[in-house]
Amino acid sequence: MNNTIQEVSVDLHDWRDEQEAWNNRSKFFVELHNRADRKAQVTDFLSFLKDEYLLPPDGGTALDIGCGVGDYALGLAREGYKTTGIDLSDGMIHGAKQLADKEGFDVNLYIAPWSEETRQRLGWDKTFDLVYSIFCPIMFDVDNIRAMHNASYDTCLWIAFSERKDETVDMLSEHFFGRDSFPWASKVKACLDAIHEIGHNVKVTYKTVPETEVMSLDKAVDYFTMRLHNNGWGIMEDMKREIRQLIEPRAIDGEIHNKTVDTVAWVSWSVK
């Protein structure tokens, strides 16, 4: 095995708080890796690539932008592809290395925020057969979509939320930070406009995914704190106590039932 980690020499000054926030979530995502629902998501991803003829040629290369702990990169590695992952969070990247080492697959790993500067610094000019990004917040920036396109030799896949409804997170987020004003529709439209401008054979598929998450009160407190806490808010334990007070009245027999409905855009295109 040759699971290397390289920290890219780019300025992280403006990214430190976000990096730490994702680092604090990395343990959760390592534990999520072997859960049945995560395995099903990876299987669905691979099936989509196969059905849409997006898989690299045998032994080909793939880049995962915002790879997290490498769930999807490892899924491709199991199929015999040479995979690379890049993520802002060093905690996530070290989690990816831990999982890759355990499973016996090679994944090249890089720590950096994705940008055109990062792409150029790494010399990734039409380097990978497939470049993809899954639920990576930074990819709502059109310039980062263009950088993704420039890193690909053949095809790209961008998977992103176009609408999110999360009963408990929405309530807690409004309590702590005010009503969510993220312009999902306009952000997705701007990215789609850019993709139609630069790409060929663009295909957009929307999937609506309803789900009810059931967890104990203690696990729910930890989970929603992990989802919401950032350094700008304050002390994590203070948020935990407040979250417990807010969600405990919603518990049914000691469990929290959280209903979510996500609308997800699967956008594929060819670069040539």
Model region roles, listed by residue range:
Residues 1-57, 59-68, 157-182:
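Conserved class I S-adenosyl-L-methionine
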Residues 203-272:
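Conserved Class I S-adenosyl-L-methionine
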Residues 71-117:
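Class I SAM-dependent methyltransferase SAM/SAH-binding core
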Residues 142-157:
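A short glycine-rich, Lys/Arg-flanked "PGG" loop and its adjoining helix->strand segment in the class I
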Residues 128-143:
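A short SAM/SAH-binding and catalytic strip from SAM-dependent methyltransferases
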Residues 184-199:
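Short alpha-helix
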